[in-house]
Amino acid sequence: MWKIGQRGVPYFQRLIAAPFTTLRSLPTSLVETGQNRVIDASLTLIRERAKLKGELVRLIGGAKATTALLGVPLGHNSSFLEGPALAPPHVREAIWCGSTNSTTEEGKELKDPRVLSDVGDIPVQEIREMGVDDDRLMKVVSESVKLVMEEEPLRPLVIGGDHSISYPVVRAVSEKLGGPVDILHLDAHPDIYDRFEGNYYSHASSFARIMEGGYARRLLQVGIRSINKEGREQGKRFGVEQYEMRTFSKDRQMLENLKLGEGVKGVYISIDVDCLDPGFAHGVSHFEPGGLSFRDVLNILHNLQGDLVGADVVEYNPQRDTADDMTAMVAAKFVRELAAKMSK
C-alpha cells in the first residue's frame, strides 16, 4: 500500500512527476493527440461496460431502476490527505468480502444484477499522467456518468475519491435528466467555499459549483460540525438548509421523515464518510468528533421519501483505516443500502 506524507502528498504523485516533465518537452499537437486517445479509450471502456450491464438487466426484465456502481479514484483535490484516490477497490472488496451476506436491510439481494451492477472505474490516474487538466477531467467524469445513464434502467452510484467528484456527477445527472434535483448531503463540513486555497475544484468547494450551476433546487446539509463564517454566508447565499450537529436532537424527527424531489427530477444523496463520528469511521482524512452514528444515517436514508436518481459515497481514506479495514465495511454498507434505495 502506498504511504502518504504529513501534508498528504502521496507516493504515486511523485511517480507521475517524471511523465509530466517528459510531456512538457513534446510538441503540443502530439501531447493533445495522446490525451484525446486516452480519454476516448476511457469513455469507450465505460460505455461498453454500461451497455453490457444494461443489456443484461433488460434481458432479465422487471427492473424500473438499477444501481450502477462507478468508481472515480480521484484524490488530488483534497486539501489535506489524498488517500481517497485509493478507496474504490477497498470498498468493492468490502461489499463482497463474505463476512456478511449479500442481502440489504430492506431485503434486496445485491447479487441480483437488477439491484446492483458494476461498470468499473474511470482510469483517473492514467488520464492525469497524460497532463489532462481538471477542467477536462471533470468533463470526462460527467460524460462517463451520462454514458451510464443512457443505458436504462441504470442509475449512477459513484464511489470516490474525494468530494470534488460530486460536482461533475451531479452536473451530469441534472443535465441528463433535464433539470435540477434535490440533494441530501451528509457531511461534517459544508464543502461550499467559493475557492478553497484557490482551488476552483477543491473538495471543499464542490457544492458551491453545484449551486452556481443551478443543478440543485434544494440542498440539505446534515451532520455539519465544522463550519466557519464563509460556510454560513455561502449557505445563505445559495439558500442551503444547514443542519448542524449541535441541534441534531431537535432536528432528528424532521430529518428522519424527509420528503424530497417533488417538482424536480428526483433526489441525489451525497455521503461523506466523515459525517459519522470518528468512533464509527476512523478511515477518513478529517477527524471531526461529535458526529452522527451509523444508525442515525441509516434511519434518515431508509425513511426518506423520494425518487433516488443518483448518489455518491466519498472521502473514505484507506490510509487512515484500522488494520481490519472497518471503515471500508462502513462505506460498503452505505453503498449496499443506497443500492437498495435506488433500485426498483
From Swiss-Prot:
Note accompanying the cofactor annotation: Binds 2 manganese ions per subunit.
Binding site for Mn(2+) 1: 163, 187, 191, 272
Parts forming coiled coils: none
Entry protein name: Arginase 2, chloroplastic/mitochondrial
Family to which the UniProt record says this protein belongs: Belongs to the arginase family.
Keywords: Arginine metabolism, Chloroplast, Hydrolase, Manganese, Metal-binding, Mitochondrion, Plastid, Putrescine biosynthesis, Transit peptide
Locations listed in the record: Mitochondrion; Plastid, Chloroplast
Residue interval of the organelle targeting sequence: 1-26
Gene: ARGAH2
Reported function: Catalyzes the hydrolysis of L-arginine to urea and L-ornithine. The latter can be utilized in the urea cycle or as a precursor for the synthesis of both polyamines and proline. Possesses agmatinase activity. Catalyzes the formation of putrescine from agmatine.
Catalytic activity: L-arginine + H2O = urea + L-ornithine; agmatine + H2O = urea + putrescine
Enzyme Commission code(s) on record: 3.5.3.1, 3.5.3.11
GO cellular component term of the entry, any: mitochondrion
Cofactor: Mn(2+)
Disruption phenotype: Increased formation of lateral and adventitious roots and increased production of NO in roots.
Residues annotated for Mn(2+) 2 binding in this entry: 187, 189, 272, 274
Induction: By methyl jasmonate and infection with the fungal pathogen B.cinerea.
GO BP annotations listed: defense response to fungus; ornithine metabolic process; proline metabolic process; putrescine biosynthetic process; putrescine biosynthetic process from arginine, via agmatine; putrescine metabolic process; tyrosine metabolic process; urea cycle
Pathway: Nitrogen metabolism; urea cycle; L-ornithine and urea from L-arginine: step 1/1; Amine and polyamine biosynthesis; putrescine biosynthesis via agmatine pathway; putrescine from agmatine: step 1/1
Binding sites annotated in the UniProt record for substrate: 189-193, 197-199, 228, 315
Keyword field contains Metal-binding: yes
Lineage: Eukaryota, Viridiplantae, Streptophyta, Embryophyta, Tracheophyta
Organism in which the protein naturally occurs: Arabidopsis thaliana
Pfam family of the protein (one): Arginase
GO terms assigned for molecular function: agmatinase activity; arginase activity; cobalt ion binding
Family matches, as PROSITE patterns: ARGINASE_2
